Structure formats: structure tokens, C-alpha cells
């Protein structure tokens, strides 16, 4: 009888340990998001070489440190922010904005060679500062920052921007779509200011 009790205790301990491990291993699914491309003329790829003497160098994109994390940021109250742990950017926000900016401005400004690499002496040098790129408790996507553009004669122009794009639905999918739309609207406005 004495030998049965220790065996029973061992079986009971193993069973409880197995249950504990089984309950604690609930895997949380992570979702990864990328800024969408919604420009209608983006799909028109030229099959011929272009010639231009206009070069736009995207020198830097500085994203506020609280935004440049792997998790998507939400403003939960007037002075409170939270970074998502399971809804993440597929690449850093600064990298995604750089990629979008190069690709979209190339489409929007066909007379310019646009690159984040300094290929030659630039006609225009662009610095971008992002101070807001997040969801808000108001149900909007918030995009804020400023452009600093220097021409070849060292003339400097700045343009601040602030956009609130209403979400069409709840959730991170809707937030990223609203951020993408707001960003491309800002790129369009910036491109128009360069053309004129």
C-alpha cells in the first residue's frame, strides 16, 4: 500500500504538469501589416528608358521614436499611447515610408529621378519628419509631420502637414488602410507642390 501512494503521487504530478503546460501554451497569432499602394497610375510601367536631368534625393525620413517600433501605435486617450504586441508592421515604419515615397513619387513626378541613394547632385533634397502616424481613440488615423526641401541653390522650403482620416471599420486592417490612404493623399499634395 505504501508503494502505491508514491506511484499515485507521481502520476498525479505528471498529469497536473501536462495540463498546466497545455493550458499555458495557447499560441497568440500575430498579424503583420504593410502600407498599401492605391495610386492608380502606379501599374503603368514604362518599357523604355527615360531621360531626365531632375534628381530628387530623399536624404532622410525621421520617424518619432514612439512610432518607429514593430507594433502599430494607438492613441488610447488624449495623452496616452499603446503599442500593439500582436499587430505589427512587416518592416519598420521608416523603411515602409521610404519605400512608398520612392515608388509613389516616381509615379507622381515622372520628370524626376527619385531615390534615397545620392546618385548625382540633386535638384531637390527632401527631408521628411513624421511626428504622428497612428490610430486614435477618435476613430481616425492620424498623420502629422513636415517636409523640408532644399533646392540646388540652397533655398529651403518647409511644409507642415496634419491629416485625420476616418476609419471605415473597426480593427487594424481598417487602420492601416486609412493610414495608407492618408499617406498617399499627402504624397499627392507634396508632388503637386513640386510641380507648381
Labelled PLM ranges:
Residues 24-32, 36-46, 169-196:
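C-terminal/domain-edge helix-coil "capping" segments
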Residues 24-43, 107-153:
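Surface-exposed short loop/turn segments
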Residues 53-121:
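N-terminal segment of the mature soluble domain
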Residues 2-12:
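Bacterial N-terminal signal peptides that target proteins for export
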Residues 39-59:
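N-terminal secretory signal peptides
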Residues 19-22:
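C-terminal motif of bacterial Sec signal peptides marking the signal peptidase cleavage site
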Residues 80-88, 154-185:
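Short secondary-structure boundary motifs at beta->alpha junctions and helix caps
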Residues 55-60, 73, 125-130, 142-146, ...:
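Soluble periplasmic/extracytoplasmic beta-strand elements of cell-envelope proteins
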